[in-house]
Amino acid sequence: MLRNTILCSAAALLLVASLTACGNQDNTSSVVSEESAPSSVAEVKYENINPLTGENNLATSAKGQRPIAFMINNNPSARPHWGLCSADVVIEGLVEGGSTRMMWLFSDVSNVPKIGSLRSMRHDFVEIADGFDAVLVHWGGSPQAYTSVSTNGVDELDGLSYEGSYFFRDSTRNVAIEHTGYTTGENILTLMEQKEIETKANSQYASPFTFGKPDEKRTLTDGTCKQVDVFFSTAGYNHTFTYDESDGLYYNSIEGTPMKDDNGQQMAVTNVIGLYMNVSTIAGDGSGRVDMDLSGGE
């Protein structure tokens, strides 16, 4: 089964996709399909494919719905995260100061548990969310991000406007207030209805991912990769994904420590995608915010 995806890069972005999972999962991931003998068995129809993971497990009520994207704090004080192992796709990229921020994507907002801690958006992530036709959930943002929201017409929900009603603070960890913001899928769904935000996916939208059929046999042809090291520019944000042959998943550690959610489950994924791109400091920005070149790379 295809599990959640994380995206990171030594230079800028890390994408972990096809599902972020925690714990043991069945291993049916693959890269190249094998030819099979003709069969008289009727072809199975998959009517509930999750467009972010390729799995045939999307609730009927979520079919044709827009994904929801959450801006997530990745400061060490914000770990362990609430809801990490529930995300379909995790995208991580550089922000100012050499630190990273994450954007988690969900195909079904009703499945979003307590999630956080939430942080402010950056313009690069606004563009990525727009590319997924997603509703962007965040707590504040940079001037460039708010400009991008306006320019691109991105639907967004800002915790600064709804603190105490749909967005909340959890002070039980005794950390700085910027590491305490959270919400839930139920709150976001209610707020979207209140604000009359379109929930149906744009008819012109196509998933950026191409998946095989859930039961399609696959075999790897480009060798074995038992470990993936992802280095950002600053200590505290570097990952190691270690392959486990028993379940076919890559288990994520950050700075040598298993990356776990608030329930104590380690993040494990099927696909790790690294994107290398140019990153530059925005001229005249007093906070040293950066711009990731999303128009190219490899």
Task: Give, region by region, the residue ranges found by the protein language model.
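Core hydrophobic alpha-helical transmembrane segments of single-pass membrane proteins
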Residues: A12-L15
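C-terminal motif of bacterial Sec signal peptides marking the signal peptidase cleavage site
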Residues: A17-A21
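Bacterial N-terminal signal peptides that target proteins for export
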Residues: M1-S9
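A surface/extracellular/periplasmic glyco- and lipid-processing/surface-interacting theme
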Residues: S29-V89, E96-E298
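Bacterial signal peptide processing site
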Residues: G23-D26
